[in-house]
């Protein structure tokens, strides 16, 4: 599938590269998204909320800062997993010197 370049995603800085793994038909109404996401150094995915769904990130490469529900930040790196349940929010910033690549999975409740 085609890689999408999205500017200021969810109010974040710079741009995000989004490579969908499954198309809408394959997601079958059960998932909102399954994609490989790339944040270049200095870019971020802005804080956003999830309602009626949850989202998991699995960090493949790079490092950055993860905004957990707008109340705390934590450092994340390759191999880390984040989970944002229904009714909560999150954001992610690449604070490293290399691309941060992660898998994003949105599961509908």
Q: Language-model segments: what does each one mean?
A:
Residues 20-23, 35-51, 86:
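Conserved short histidine dyad/triad with adjacent acidic residue
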Residues 73, 86-109:
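Ligand-binding loop in jelly-roll beta-barrel domains
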Residues 70-86:
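Short acidic-glycine-tyrosine-enriched beta hairpin
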Residues 45-51, 68, 74-75, 93-95:
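Short histidine-centered beta-strand/loop micro-motifs
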Residues 1-32, 46:
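A short, N-terminal "cap"/entry segment at the start of jelly-roll beta-barrel domains
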Residues 52-54, 58-64:
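Glycine- and acidic-residue-biased ligand/ion/polar-headgroup-sensing regions
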Residues 44-46, 65, 82, 86-92:
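Histidine-centered metal-chelating micro-motifs
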